[in-house]
From Swiss-Prot:
Keywords, alphabetical: Coiled coil, Cytoplasm, Motor protein, Muscle protein, Myosin, Phosphoprotein, Thick filament
Tissue expr: Found in all adult muscle tissues except in indirect flight muscles and a set of temporary abdominal muscles. Not detected in larval muscle.
The protein's role, per its UniProt record: Paramyosin is a major structural component of many thick filaments isolated from invertebrate muscles.
Family (UniProt): Belongs to the paramyosin family.
Name of the featured protein: Paramyosin, short form
Presence of the UniProt keyword Cytoplasm in the record: yes
GO cellular component: cytoplasm; cytoskeleton; myosin complex; striated muscle myosin thick filament
Post-translational modification: Phosphorylated.
Entry coiled-coil feature ranges: 123-619
Superkingdom, taxonomy of origin: Eukaryota
Gene Ontology molecular-function annotations: Rho-dependent protein serine/threonine kinase activity
Coiled coil recorded as keyword: yes
Region annotation (Nonhelical region) ranges: 1-122, 420-640
Amino acid sequence: MALALKQRPSRFRPTTTTYEDNYGYTMNFYQPMLDYLDAKAKGLEVKKPHLPWVSERGLKQYRPSNAVRQYNADEIVRLSRTCAARADEILLNFRAQKRSPFSVQKLVDASRVTKHLEPDTVVERSRQRRRRRQEELEDLIKRDTLKILQRIRKIELDNELDKMSDDFKRSIRGKSASAIAQALLSESEKNIKTAKKEEEDYIAQTLVRSSRAVSRARSRSSSPLDGQYRAHALHIELMDDRLVDKLDHRVSSSLHNVKRQLSTLNQRTVEFYADSSKQTSIEIEQLNARVIEAETRLKTEVTRIKKKLQIQITELEMSLDVANKTNIDLQKVIKKQSLQLTELQAHYEDVQRQLQATLDQYAVAQRRLAGLNGELEEVRSHLDSANRAKRTVELQYEEAASRINELTTANVSLVSIKSKLEQELSVVASDYEEVSKELRISDERYQKVQVELKHVVEQVHEEQERIVKLETIKKSLEVEVKNLSIRLEEVELNAVAGSKRIISKLEARIRDLELELEEEKRRHAETIKILRKKERTVKEVLVQCEEDQKNLILLQDALDKSTAKINIYRRQLSEQEGVSQQTTTRVRRFQRELEAAEDRADTAESSLNIIRAKHRTFVTTSTVPGSQVYIQETTRTITE
């Protein structure tokens, strides 16, 4: 098998190319997905397949990021030869064994990619199509019959008494009871006539639609079929004819019943309107008077409640403005205090740096003192040998004098640093006093804010009491509405079916009143929401005040810590002063020792002079004739 393929990108996988990893892709990716799709098609509840995109089963080589290696013709020939040789080796040692059903089933599942295909033939498709047509026809007939029956029941139950137009309502207003009864009778007759016409038109349309559907079904079923299915098609046509006859019979009987019921209903309505027109007119006038009184009461109550709520809302808004202003002032104070704290921290860092510099200078002075100690020991050794090396003693004296000058300058610098630190400590103490004053002022402001918050809470309690009063008024109005509804129910029991429209008018009026009540309830709920929002803002102000108090406490703690650090620095300064005093005492002691050494040197010089004065040598020269010079040295010891 020779394949001549061009070099293509690594992700391109043509369908006609042989790859090494096709079996791995099939068994680990495609086969679980195909099994999942088959189970979903059967309606089973199956978990989604786990596709191993990570290297959890040794499938790292099947990642899409890896390049796919293609085979050329020589590699395919080599692989086929190795496979044939391996097959020959296996056949030599092969023994036929009986497989278990489980292993056979697993082998079959592994060898196929698509499985469980249902049979699909022409006969089955034609049967399904015929069955589908028959079901559609039966559903259409059922829907038509149900619509006709529902329409008949609606006509029987609904007398069209509640369907008054707006123009008719306007024409009735302000008329007497007899005129209203006459108008209702004429309107009912018109409604009955229009209902009859609509019913006849609807029944005619349904009959035409059903006949068309039947003819369409027959034309479909009369299409040329195979010889073995024609008898079945004729049987279906006979069943369709029977169904159409039954439906026609049902429709005609239902129409006859509807006409008879409509005529009896018309007679009853005329009699009822004639008998009960007087009673209904009197009751209508009484109910109108009551409704007008209730409307006036409700309007007055609503206006009064609106005014009260508006006044309360304005008061709450003013209190909120005051609380917001106080909150802004507190925030400004907190910002100022935070800036002062940052300045204090910077000043503290400067003081700490200066102390570190003084400590470094102190360490240098200690090192110098150690050097001076060593030099003093050397001076003592030189003083012991002063009689032998006076010159060396003088040089060491000069060096000691220069070093003493350096120590005196260092001492002067330490004294100046001490004065500077004392000045800085006084500045820090003054800053601390200013911060404490500002803290007292902020505490006073916080107490004022707490008093104002208590006042706001008292106002909120008063608003809640007013809301309770409004709820009692609402309950009394609901009781009145219930009494009116009970009265209306009594009128409905005593009145005739023809007076339902008049009562419905009153019910509409009561519904309007109820709607107005609901609007008032909604407005009341909105006011309650506004009050809750105000309470939330008050709580937020309280929380902010608590946070401000916490911040003040933190500032106080920071100031306490700074004072403690300042005390520590004072102690360190006092210790440094003690050390500097010790160094000055040592320097003075060294000066005394040097003075004693100088005195010893002076005494040594004086003793040397005395010794020289005691032991003097005299040199005399004499000349002899003949140019000879004689030198005579004589020593004299002067004894006292």
